[in-house]
Structure formats: C-alpha cells, structure tokens
C-alpha cells in the first residue's frame, strides 16, 4: 500500500542523509503500483530510522562489526525481535548465534519464513501472539479458571 512505499522512501532518505551508501535499488519500482525495488544499503548510522523501527519491506542493510560480541550486542540492543537471519559456514557460530540472539525466530543460511506447523511469534515490541502450530490457536483463546466450593 502507499503507506509502506512512503515508509520505504523515508527509511532510505534518512539513511542516505546520515551517511549510508545506497548500493542497489532504493526507489519505487517503475513508479507504478505499490512495489519497492529490492534495496541494498551499507554503512548504516546507529541513529538511522532503520536501526530503531521495523522495516517490513525489501531493504537489506549491511553492517560491519568489530567482533562476535559486537554482533550479539547490536542485534540484541534493538527494541524489536521478530526475526533474525544469520549467514555463516561455521557450525559453531550457527549454534552459538541461534542461542544468543534474542528474537522470535532465527534463520540460519536462509531467508525463508518459519515452517507453518511450528509456532512463531516476535518478542520485545514485535508481533502479537503466535502464528503456526497449536500455539497460534491458543493465542486467540482465553482461559478461565472457575472455582466452585
């Protein structure tokens, strides 16, 4: 919808204004419809909107980190925790990051969504309840405790 296209433009404009480098995309697709080009951007300033708000669009922001602890600290410092995506060939890092990143889901070496039969939901300020699996149904139910003496 037009609000998401406007939001994507705001994210990119803000990032570029704050010194980020636009590598690919960064605009409405052919100025028609409500499609945003897949966008790749690097050198994101920590004060940029895309570091404090959920993007929900085809923007991939690339970051450089000083070491492993810096990666975990920055990932977990965000107010949101819907999903996290990790790409590494190291099985040790795969396991360690999956455990240490605070998010509703962590995908390793894939950008595909979670499996539909497995409950999935965000944490922190991301998402409401769960989707997928029996826990998704439970999130729409209210339990009632009745005591009769």
Say what each PLM segment does.
Residues 1-9:
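Short beta-strand to alpha-helix junction loop
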Residues 12:
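Acidic-enriched catalytic cores of C-N bond-cleaving enzymes acting on peptides and small amides
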Residues 19-28:
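Short secondary-structure junctions
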Residues 28, 35-149:
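Conserved C-terminal structural/oligomerization subdomain of aldehyde/semialdehyde dehydrogenase
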